[in-house]
Design a protein with these regions (language model features):
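Generic alpha-helical secondary structure signal
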Residues: 7, 11, 44-47, 51, ...
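Intrinsically disordered, low-complexity regions enriched in small/polar residues
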Residues: 11, 40, 52-55, 85, ...
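Amphipathic alpha-helical interaction modules
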Residues: 24-68
């Protein structure tokens, strides 16, 4: 019998990101709309539209960092490092535009 090895923290991170998506649906939709507005903008408007998009992305990242750091603070240092690495991996898979450079 072969046991499937589960990724550490997979279940808790999945639940955290599901909850994040529900609780921040409006902000995530704003990010999508801002990206579309930037993509559709005329050259003279593009820089301003991009700035708005970047501000929204930073807000999402700040909230994701808060979620990650809040849970990590309940763990010992070594376990927290493993959790943060697993969180970053799942975040890059699920939300690539938000997870590239979390501190």
């Amino acid at each position: 019998m072969r046991l499937r090895r589960r990724r550490p923290f997979a279940e808790v991170i999945e639940r955290q990101l599901d909850m994040f998506a529900r609780d921040h649906a409006g902000l995530l939709a704003e990010c999508d709309a801002a990206l579309r507005a930037y993509d559709d903008a005329a050259a003279e408007e593009a820089e301003e539209r991009y700035g708005g998009y970047v501000d929204l992305i930073e807000a999402v990242r700040d909230d994701l960092e808060g979620l990650r750091d809040g849970f990590a603070s309940t763990l010992d240092e070594e376990t927290a490092e493993r959790y943060e690495a697993a969180f970053a991996l799942e975040l890059r898979r699920r939300y690539p535009r938000y997870g590239l450079d979390l501190d």
